[in-house]
Amino acid sequence: MCFALSLSIYKHTGTPPNKCRLNSALKRNRATVRLDIGQRGSLCPPFSMSAVRPPVFIGLLLLILTTGYCKPRDRDETSLLELLMDRVRQTQEHHSEGNTQHPPQIIEHSLETKDVNKVTKSYQHERILEVFPRDLRQKDKFLKHLTGPLYFSPKCSKLFYKLYNNTRDCTIPAYYKRCARLLTRLAGSQRCTEG
């Protein structure tokens, strides 16, 4: 049916239709009509499949070739996940062996760590930031981050320096939150806001 329709379109227009591919013999001689060798027995040649066949066959061929190319893995080519899991197992075994060989040691803490423990007990619901600045600029940056920009009048500068340099709250890094709170209260006090 499709073939007869294409033949009638060819006779009226003089050009072969796009839907059905006709043989070159049809172009030369209008009386002889032949289908391609692979299209015998069908009324309408499968025109859409002819354009798709080569890429599909090449893709299938590549797929078959790549799946067949598998070599057994050596022990040297282990994945990163396997290496990490082995390392975790080794450390767990090492710790379990260490606990059975040596009894736990009693460690005495210094005065500073006891102070830090007191701070964590008093502020159980707040998260304590422990920052250990190596120089005063880092201490300044950290306190400015907590308090924001503060201004102290000349009358208040002596109290500020005493608080900033001599109190335990502003010299021990574990107490910097308290120091920030004290500095903001000092900046907002009547003595510092006057003049």
Swiss-Prot record:
The keyword Nucleotide-binding does not apply. Disruption phenotype: Reduced number of iridophores in the eye. Fishes lacking alkal2b do not exhibit any defects in trunk iridophores in adults. Fishes lacking both alkal1 and alkal2b show a complete loss of eye iridophores. Fishes lacking alkal1, alkal2a and alkal2b are embryonic lethal and display total loss of iridophores. Its main location: secreted. One of its GO terms (molecular function) is receptor signaling protein tyrosine kinase activator activity. It is found in: Secreted; Cell membrane. Keywords: Cell membrane, Cytokine, Disulfide bond, Membrane, Secreted, Signal. GO terms for cellular component: extracellular space; plasma membrane. Disulfide bonds join 156-192, 170-179. The keyword Secreted applies. GO terms for biological process: iridophore differentiation; positive regulation of ERK1 and ERK2 cascade; positive regulation of ERK5 cascade. Highly expressed in the swim bladder and single cells of unknown identity in the head. InterPro entries: ALKL1/2. Transmembrane segments: none annotated. Belongs to the ALKAL family. Homodimer. Cytokine that acts as a physiological ligand for receptor tyrosine kinases LTK and ALK. Required for neural crest cell differentiation and iridophore development during embryonic iridophore development and adult stripe development by acting as a receptor for LTK. Also required for iridophore formation in the adult eye. PANTHER family: ALK AND LTK LIGAND 2, ALK AND LTK LIGAND 2-RELATED. This is ALK and LTK ligand 2b. It comes from Danio rerio (Zebrafish). The gene is alkal2b.
